[in-house]
Amino acid sequence: MAETPFHIPVLVNECLSWFSDRNPRSFCDVTVGAGGHAEAFLSTYPSIISYDGSDRDATALSLARERLEKFGDRVHLHHASFEDLAQDPKENVYDGILADLGVSSMQLDTLSRGFSFQGEDHDLDMRMDTSQGITASEVLNTLREEELGKIFREYGEEPHWKNVANAIVHFRRRKKIITVKDLKEATARVFPSYRLRKKIHPLTLIFQALRVYVNQEDVQLKVLLESAMRWLAPKGRLVIISFCSSEDRPVKWFFREAEKSGLGKILTKKVVMPTYEEIRRNPRCRSAKLRCFEKTS
């Protein structure tokens, strides 16, 4: 597959609709990526005079900078993780905050990043921010079998987590797991035949688990949710798009607890999902789930 810096933003109209009854002035996009959602918001809502966009991926951020240049000083872009952003003491600032979690199509299709199991000869990197942190390859070659199993079980919800961890540890005794091809070889005999016959690649959940662990996505998400309540202005809305249960479940739980505590109300009593038409155009969005929360004070 040819490498291409292309990303299709998900649930764009649904994101926009949560602000159609107001004229947002300040907005924060903590996963600005290549700028797809940002472009839609800035075009749809001329009332936005300050759009703060951030991302851990410097490559994506450079694309966003080009794409959003036409909006001039309405846009402010930052290379930052959720934890970096949490250091800012701002309060009651934003009318809206958007987080599009997980990995983007652009990151998947850039095979050298190691996010996709289609990149046979590429290194297993998987870092959102390639300037820091450990790679997926380092994780696979250094962690104990019990630790690997826990990652696959908790972050990937892989039914065969124990067998996968065992196979990896046995394989790396004779050869380091560096590339996607190495990981495929290491786990070649692990999955039952029915998993091999499915359209979804058997390593999908393992790749998901490694990505979440490498990027500390669970920790980052917790920090974001807590910080967002502080950043939002009264009546401000937080929109979060997730792609797997390990992302959606903490969001769902946090919103429920925040509502019980009187911080605001859940606007999505039923989770919002892509339409059939959007899934037809962009099959990768099929697992997307959108939730929205409004702060009261």
UniProtKB/Swiss-Prot annotation:
Q: Where is the protein situated, by its record's location annotation?
A: Cytoplasm
Record-listed E.C. numbers: 2.1.1.199
Q: Which residues does the annotation say bind S-adenosyl-L-methionine?
A: G35, G36, H37, D55, F82, D100, Q107
One Pfam match: Methyltransf_5
Q: Which domain of life is it from?
A: Bacteria
Keywords on record: Cytoplasm, Methyltransferase, rRNA processing, S-adenosyl-L-methionine, Transferase
- Example GO molecular function term? rRNA (cytosine-N4-)-methyltransferase activity
| Record GO biological process | rRNA base methylation
Entry keyword annotation includes Methyltransferase: yes
Please tell me whether the keyword Zinc-finger is annotated for this protein.
no
Q: What's an example GO cellular component term for this entry? A: cytoplasm
Q: Which reaction does it catalyse?
A: cytidine(1402) in 16S rRNA + S-adenosyl-L-methionine = N(4)-methylcytidine(1402) in 16S rRNA + S-adenosyl-L-homocysteine + H(+)
Where primarily located? cytoplasm
Its job: Specifically methylates the N4 position of cytidine in position 1402 (C1402) of 16S rRNA.
What family is this?
A: Belongs to the methyltransferase superfamily. RsmH family.
Question: What is this protein's record name?
Answer: Ribosomal RNA small subunit methyltransferase H
